[in-house]
């Protein structure tokens, strides 16, 4: 077992599949915990997800959650799926919710898995921010492009999709981070 893992789930439509990742990752980690961005809760029932993970951090139900304690309690922090909005916030040090505050505090343990439509992915501001993250030792997965259903257009299109669970695990374990000082 590889220690404790925190999944920071953002408001990307593929967050609806996060339970599959939790179940599979639990086979490899001592604990798999989850923290949702406020907007991601519009896509998923967090009460159901409590059945899959070890702990679900909810800043609304527990406003006294401490970002430093959360970071210190985990060896790995995954932003899965990572929306363009959250990637841009992390790169620019914007801490307007518990998820982005945890990511900024624990950047040395951070792994980002982008998931968005191809137009957002190609945005030069986003690409600049991804380069900024990579240049500061944040591990950003080179995303997969697959045909997927795009909610906004109602059509199947090539988009940036979440990697399969095996690729997530391999990326994390092959790019382990140094501990925080």
Curated annotation (Swiss-Prot):
Effect upon mutating residue 83 to A: Loss of FMN binding
Family annotation (SUPFAM superfamilies): Homo-oligomeric flavin-containing Cys decarboxylases, HFCD (SSF52507)
Cofactor binding comment, as recorded: Binds 1 FMN per subunit.
Pfam families: Flavoprotein
Active-site residues from the entry: 67
Claim: Isomerase is one of the keywords in the record: no
Segments crossing the lipid bilayer: none
Superkingdom as given in the UniProt entry: Bacteria
EC class name: lyase
Keywords tagged on the record: Flavoprotein, FMN, Lyase, Plasmid
Entry EC number(s): 4.1.1.-
A GO molecular-function annotation: FMN binding
Phenotype when changing residue 85 to D/H: Loss of FMN binding
Cofactor(s) needed: FMN
GO biological process: coenzyme A biosynthetic process
Gene Ontology cellular component list: phosphopantothenoylcysteine decarboxylase complex
Family label: Belongs to the HFCD (homooligomeric flavin containing Cys decarboxylase) superfamily.
Quaternary organization: Homododecamer.
Function (record text): Catalyzes the removal of two reducing equivalents (oxidative decarboxylation) from the cysteine residue of the C-terminal meso-lanthionine of epidermin to form a --C==C-- double bond.
Protein known as: Epidermin decarboxylase
Organism: Staphylococcus epidermidis
